[in-house]
Amino acid sequence: MGRIDITILGSGSAVPSLHRWHPSILVKDWMGNTVLLDAGEGVQIRLRKVGVSPSSIDVLAITHPHGDHINGVAGLLMTMSLQSRRKPLTIISTSESLEFISETLEATRENLGFEVMLVDARESGVLDVGRPSGDRLTIEWERACHNIESLAFKLVWTLRPRIDARILERLDLKAGPWIRELIEKGRAHVEGRIVTLKDISASGERKYSVAYTGDTSPCTRVAKFLHGSDILIHDSTLDSSLAREAAERGHSTSLDAARNALTSGAKLLILFHVSSRYSGYEARLLLKEARRVFPNTVLSWDGMKLSITI
């Protein structure tokens, strides 16, 4: 088993409020991988508030270059530099976002002291997040349906088959150094024979995924990409009475989010990117609306934490 921790650093939209800052989501897993989805203004303050060092981030995935999703990147990189970061950082985003980041660094003449690997996500794609383990994390992306080029992301964990002690006993095999080789390579030489993970596992490979739409209006491409997600973090800027306005601005309503959660087969829907016009208790309108279609829905708030054991 493994554990995934999701922390909502900022749950708001274009206009921040005292209670909802610009969008940003931190995802950490049991292998030590740390991914930051979007980096709104003030993200490094939010990281400090939850006790996470910016230098622990391995991958920064930016959906698009609108200010509420990207304005925190420059300060974040500079803080990493001041913390003497040395390990490389991967940034995945659209070409416009990467150009914005590069030009900002050039304008400030910052010498970061660590390598920044830019991944230009022009079309759909996949990135392996590298840490040595039998389990694996990959990040997938697809173009969203916003008013500028934007991305939706999906974090997919592939869990290797788990070794069953009862099968080891039945095969008269004793645990030893060969177990590590087996986990890393899928097979090992043991007492004159080749043993595979399949031979000593009660179940096969499993997958678990967390999808994040970024800013998007409902469309077939995004719905298809979200299919099979276990947790769905979905744009829910407005309620359904403002569906026309949401569509014109390239956003979704809470009802749109619920419908996508239902068709995707998700187990949990998290409403995200909430407009500042819903202050305090008024935001519950979004939750009430979504739950009529998809009951297992929660409304995100700044500082919200979710831990999942898979």
From Swiss-Prot:
* Record has tRNA processing as a keyword: yes
Q: What is its EC number?
A: 3.1.26.11
- UniProt binding sites for Zn(2+) 2: D68, H69, D215, H273
InterPro entries found in the cross-reference section = Metallo-B-lactamas (IPR001279), RibonucZ/Hydroxyglut_hydro (IPR036866), RNase_Z/BN (IPR013471)
Q: Which cofactor does this sequence's record say it needs?
A: Zn(2+)
Q: Where is the active site?
A: D68
How does this polypeptide assemble, per the annotation?
Homodimer.
Which reaction is recorded as catalysed by this protein?
A: Endonucleolytic cleavage of RNA, removing extra 3' nucleotides from tRNA precursor, generating 3' termini of tRNAs. A 3'-hydroxy group is left at the tRNA terminus and a 5'-phosphoryl group is left at the trailer molecule
Key word Hydrolase present: yes
Q: Which family does it belong to?
A: Belongs to the RNase Z family.
Instruction: Summarize the protein's role.
Output: Zinc phosphodiesterase, which displays some tRNA 3'-processing endonuclease activity. Probably involved in tRNA maturation, by removing a 3'-trailer from precursor tRNA.
The record's free-text note on cofactor binding: Binds 2 Zn(2+) ions.
Q: Top-level EC class, please?
A: hydrolase
Q: Which domain of life is it from?
A: Archaea
What's this protein's name? Ribonuclease Z
Matching Gene3D superfamilies, A to Z?
Answer: Ribonuclease Z/Hydroxyacylglutathione hydrolase-like
The GO terms describing molecular function are: 3'-tRNA processing endoribonuclease activity; zinc ion binding
Q: Which residues hold Zn(2+) 1?
A: H64, H66, H146, D215
List the CDD domains hit by this protein, alphabetically. Answer: RNaseZ_ZiPD-like_MBL-fold (cd07717)
Keyword tags: Endonuclease, Hydrolase, Metal-binding, Nuclease, tRNA processing, Zinc
